[in-house]
Design a protein with these regions (language model features):
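Helix-rich interaction surfaces within compact, conserved domain-sized segments
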Residues: 112-186
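C-terminal motif of bacterial Sec signal peptides marking the signal peptidase cleavage site
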Residues: 1-3
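Surface-exposed, low-hydrophobicity interaction/linker segments
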Residues: 12-80
Length: 186
């Protein structure tokens, strides 16, 4: 990531922060941080869960994972954490205006990624809105987060390149649930 900033350590966590210039000239603050490993125990689907970071990057989660795709409505984190366990990256946003241009840039990044080398299929990426997010854009990988004030394609591409691979060596190339049409947790 270009800009100012650097690596640091905060309570045993590694962090990297930078200010980058987006293609349209806006300044974007980007923070990448390692997070404590919250484990990978399973609870029942739709049980209430709490996490150590926002966005979450590990912890107790549901036995089912969300299908790797783009969603127009929020996906419960219990499903998304299971995606991370299988090596996926979750990209989430909280934009009161819907940020259609930024979502389009995110989709363009995802569409342009090389296939997953272990699956021969598209990379395991979930893109979804998240109204609980306390920043405009974020990404999670297993025990890593990226938090940013705007969508910066290079920052997200670098994060994906660095952290795409979770602790579970099972390929989990496909499958997953998509309950968005009927409601994730009735």
């Amino acid at each position: 990531m270009a800009g100012c900033g650097g690596l640091g350590s905060n309570n045993g966590r590694t962090t990297s922060d930078a200010q980058v210039q987006t293609a349209d000239g806006h300044a974007c603050n980007v923070v990448v941080a390692s997070q404590p490993n919250g484990g990978h125990l399973h609870s029942s689907d739709c049980d209430p869960l709490t996490f150590a970071s926002n966005p979450p990057s590990s912890g107790t989660h549901y036995p089912d994972w969300a299908k790797y795709k783009t969603y127009s409505a929020p996906v419960p984190w219990g499903f998304l954490i299971h995606c991370l366990e299988h090596g996926a990256i979750d990209i989430v946003y909280n934009c009161p205006d819907g940020c259609p241009d930024e979502v389009s840039q995110a989709q363009s990044l995802i569409d342009g990624l090389a296939p997953d080398p272990g699956c021969g299929a598209p990379m395991k990426i979930v893109l979804a809105p998240d109204p609980s997010l306390d920043i405009r854009w974020a990404a999670s990988a297993w025990t890593w987060t990226l938090r940013t004030t705007c969508f910066d394609k290079q920052a997200f591409a670098s994060f994906i390149a660095a952290y795409y691979q979770g602790p579970d060596t099972e390929a989990a190339c496909g499958g997953g649930l998509d309950l968005s049409a009927i409601g994730w947790c009735p």
